[in-house]
């Protein structure tokens, strides 16, 4: 095929052939200034290998949460050359909060996967794939030259042979004839070593054959009288060391104590003192960063109260009879939402400059996942009933554990609740999740005997089901007096479920 052709045509026809009716420019100038020729002019143009190759559509690493700085490519859901429509899923991206599906914004063909699945720490805005429009030759797409090479997919490090560790020999023992027949007291041992004497030169007079301090002093007197001589072992040349060893490590007493084993080289298998580095996921790094910032910058104050669940448990049993299944935690969420509606001064956040009053009560509920703790949000919880809250918690908890939460389902919130009661914890204090001002930590409910009065005023013992709740509050926004009144109101609402209607 010839490399070029000569085409004679008029201006409107040439515009049509060159595709200026499409949405993409082919690299030629547009407008009247670009067409300074009249009818019948002669044009030279190249065939499709040069002219019809349009710029590809770039797929960039998106920002899927306010705190996201990097992302990991978990899995590509489409293959190169596969047609996609707007809204189709392209890949799964692990953010600092969850695993989110990235959807296509345009119709076209996935032409080039730039960043392979499994790649980690991809910066926001980095090129991860290229697409072309339908009908274009996707095989001809090349990665732009200004794009840096994608980071390599992290692979587990190959096992390496441990480097030989310098062997530190134990101090040489002095040989003492018959030492095995004697059990030396500590004082006797020191005296014998100091005067270079051997216990076999004397007689043990202590209980159970122990060579005592007095026995050692008798040997010293005999030595001074010249009746016995020093007992020194023949000196042996010091062993050669492959590495420099401190002098104190080569010299020791005649009766050495066990030496502390040296710390081994990190990564050396099956050696004392070794450790294994655990790769931190994006979620774990963000959790560590935010909790550290919270404890170091937010002045935490704590208030604790015991709540009687007797009435709640009775209502719950009545609901079960009507096949309505709700948990104690659902009642706690509802009670917190009602209390926040009654006391809007607690439904605030701190943005660094001052408090912000929030119009909606959005409660973040802590959910434990394999990758860490995440807090999906019950939006406008004060306007929802118990059963509606229970349904929302079930759906969001499942999505959180499956890593399918959307960013809007865990970003924001005005108040947090963390419940460890199912793990048998009586009470604990939780760390505030900035910019929120408070978090409520809930323990397990437990039976407690309390002395009460019957209708006639007679004292009697009754069993009560109590839970302990501890509220951590930001003292910059919620002072101790306000936190105390909030807990009092919360306790009253929870112990009287009729108030939660």
UniProtKB/Swiss-Prot annotation:
Keyword terms: Acetylation, Lipoyl, Mitochondrion, Phosphoprotein, Transit peptide
Species of origin: Mus musculus
Subunit structure: Part of the inner core of the multimeric pyruvate dehydrogenase complex that is composed of about 48 DLAT and 12 PDHX molecules. This core binds multiple copies of pyruvate dehydrogenase (subunits PDH1A and PDHB, E1), dihydrolipoamide acetyltransferase (DLAT, E2) and lipoamide dehydrogenase (DLD, E3). Interacts with SIRT4. Interacts with DLD.
N6-lipoyllysine modifications at: 97
PTM comment: Delipoylated at Lys-97 by SIRT4, delipoylation decreases the PHD complex activity.
Residue(s) carrying N6-acetyllysine: 194
Protein name: Pyruvate dehydrogenase protein X component, mitochondrial
Ranges where the Lipoyl-binding domain occurs: 56-132
Residues with Phosphoserine modification: 196
A GO biological process held by the record: pyruvate decarboxylation to acetyl-CoA
Family: Belongs to the 2-oxoacid dehydrogenase family.
FT transit peptide: 1-53
Keyword Translocase: no
Role description: Required for anchoring dihydrolipoamide dehydrogenase (E3) to the dihydrolipoamide transacetylase (E2) core of the pyruvate dehydrogenase complexes of eukaryotes. This specific binding is essential for a functional PDH complex.
Molecular functions per Gene Ontology: acyltransferase activity; molecular adaptor activity; pyruvate dehydrogenase (NAD+) activity
């Amino acid at each position: 095929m010839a490399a070029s052709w000569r085409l004679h045509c008029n201006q409107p026809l040439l515009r049509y052939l060159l595709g200026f009716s499409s949405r993409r420019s082919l690299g030629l100038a547009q407008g009247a200034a670009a067409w300074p020729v009249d009818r019948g002019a002669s044009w030279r143009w190249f065939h499709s290998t040069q002219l019809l190759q349009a710029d590809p559509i770039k797929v960039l690493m998106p920002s899927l949460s306010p705190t996201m700085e990097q992302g990991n490519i978990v899995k590509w859901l489409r293959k190169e050359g596969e047609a996609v429509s707007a809204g189709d899923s392209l890949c799964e991206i692990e953010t600092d909060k969850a695993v989110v599906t990235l959807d296509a914004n345009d119709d076209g063909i996935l032409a080039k996967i730039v960043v392979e699945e499994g790649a980690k720490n991809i910066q926001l805005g980095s090129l991860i794939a290229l697409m072309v429009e339908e009908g274009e030759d996707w095989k001809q797409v090349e990665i732009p030259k200004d794009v840096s090479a994608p980071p390599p997919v992290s692979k587990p490090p190959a096992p390496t042979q441990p480097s030989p560790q310098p062997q530190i020999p134990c101090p040489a023992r002095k040989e003492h004839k018959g030492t095995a027949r004697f059990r030396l007291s500590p004082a006797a041992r020191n005296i014998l070593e100091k005067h270079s004497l051997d216990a076999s030169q004397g007689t043990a007079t202590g209980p159970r054959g122990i060579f005592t301090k007095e026995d050692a002093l008798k040997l010293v007197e005999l030595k001074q009288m010249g009746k016995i001589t020093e007992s020194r072992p023949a000196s042996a040349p010091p062993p050669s060391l492959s590495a420099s060893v401190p002098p104190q490590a080569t010299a020791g007493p005649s009766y050495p104590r066990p030496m502390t084993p040296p710390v081994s080289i990190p990564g050396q298998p099956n050696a004392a003192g070794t450790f294994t580095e655990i790769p931190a996921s994006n979620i774990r790094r963000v959790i560590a960063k935010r909790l550290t910032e919270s404890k170091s910058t937010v002045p935490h104050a704590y208030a604790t109260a015991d709540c009687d669940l007797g009435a709640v448990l009775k209502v719950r049993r009545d609901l079960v009879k009507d096949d309505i299944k709700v948990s104690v935690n659902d009642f706690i969420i509802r009670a917190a939402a009602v209390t926040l509606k009654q006391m809007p001064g607690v439904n605030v956040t701190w943005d660094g400059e001052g408090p912000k009053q929030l119009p909606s009560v959005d409660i973040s509920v802590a959910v434990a996942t394999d990758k860490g703790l995440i807090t999906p949000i019950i939006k406008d919880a004060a306007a929802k009933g118990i059963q509606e809250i229970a349904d929302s918690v079930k759906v969001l908890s499942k999505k959180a554990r499956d890593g399918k939460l959307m960013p809007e389902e865990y970003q924001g919130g005005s108040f947090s609740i963390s419940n460890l009661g199912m793990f048998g914890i009586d009470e604990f204090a939780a760390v505030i999740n900035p910019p929120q001002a408070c978090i409520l930590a809930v323990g397990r409910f437990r039976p407690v005997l309390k002395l009460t009065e019957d209708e006639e005023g007679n004292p009697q013992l009754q069993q009560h089901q109590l839970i302990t709740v501890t509220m951590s509050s930001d003292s910059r926004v919620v002072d101790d007096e306000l936190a105390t009144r909030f807990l009092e109101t919360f306790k009253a609402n929870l112990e009287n479920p009729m108030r939660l209607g």
